[in-house]
Design a protein with these regions (language model features):
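A generic structural signal for solvent-exposed, polar alpha-helical segments
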Residues: 53, 72, 101, 179, ...
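Generic alpha-helical scaffold signal
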Residues: 17, 36-42, 58
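Short, basic, low-complexity termini and linkers enriched in Ser/Thr/Gly/Pro
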Residues: 82-112, 214-218
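Generic low-polarity alpha-helical segments
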Residues: 34-36, 49, 60-64, 89, ...
Length: 218
């Protein structure tokens, strides 16, 4: 039995490593820790290889996007999203301005999705889905073009929203994670299937935790 387990771990080491870094990534995301981005870069690099060897091409290209958006998200989170440092500070639960030894809040704050932004992102999702589906059906041998296109397109939108610290991105992740879990189960990627089930559960936790820190603009 131990030999079988050892052999399985050896044969799936790269995927298992990617799954572990992925879980660490989501934990850091829930905690709104900026170090989620470098961890995400490592996880994405691993899954580029995993998805390529499994012929899940749209998800492979998605990981390339994750690498790029991780760099941008890292910058936005550190600089407050505009390159200007926020001047508000938090003390005893109240937002104040000034010095007096108070810690300056420079990181991007959690906000709600604006209606106009939501419309734009919906249009972007539809365009991405159609484009991805046409590419997969005409230029690749992907066996799951519909689900692959859906997951990839929605993930691109969700990751951009995460980089901007928009609260509603968690709703998108809930959908993405459970649809992805079914896809990976059918492809025999069992460590990744377990990972996305965990992702789905953690998305509900993230939804609750981020709600506590939403910036109320007056």
């Amino acid at each position: 039995m131990l030999i079988v387990i050892s052999s399985w771990i050896s044969n799936n080491f790269i995927e298992i490593f990617g799954a572990v870094t992925g879980i660490v990534y989501v934990i850091l995301e829930i905690r709104q820790t900026i170090w989620l981005w470098p961890v995400g870069i490592v996880s994405s690099a691993v899954y580029i290889w995993v998805f390529f060897t499994s012929k899940i091409y749209a998800d492979m290209s998605l990981q390339v996007y994750y690498l790029a958006i991780s760099i941008l998200g890292w910058y936005w989170w550190a600089k407050g999203g505009t390159g200007r440092r926020a001047k508000s500070t938090e003390r005893n639960g109240e937002w104040e301005n000034g010095r007096d030894g108070e810690k300056e809040k420079s990181e991007l704050q959690v906000t709600r999705l604006k209606f106009k932004t939501g419309l734009i992102l919906t249009a972007v999702f539809i365009l991405l889905y159609i484009t991805m589906y046409l590419v997969l059906t005409r230029l690749t041998d992907s066996p799951v073009p519909v689900r692959d296109s859906f997951i990839t397109s929605l993930s691109i939108v969700a990751t951009w929203m995460l980089a901007r610290k928009i609260y509603e991105h968690w709703y998108l992740w809930i959908v993405v994670n459970f649809v992805s879990a079914v896809l990976f189960l059918t492809r025999g990627l069992y460590p990744t299937f377990i990972l996305y089930i965990v992702y789905g559960i953690m998305s509900f936790i993230g939804l609750r935790e981020w709600k506590k820190t939403i910036t109320i603009k007056k």
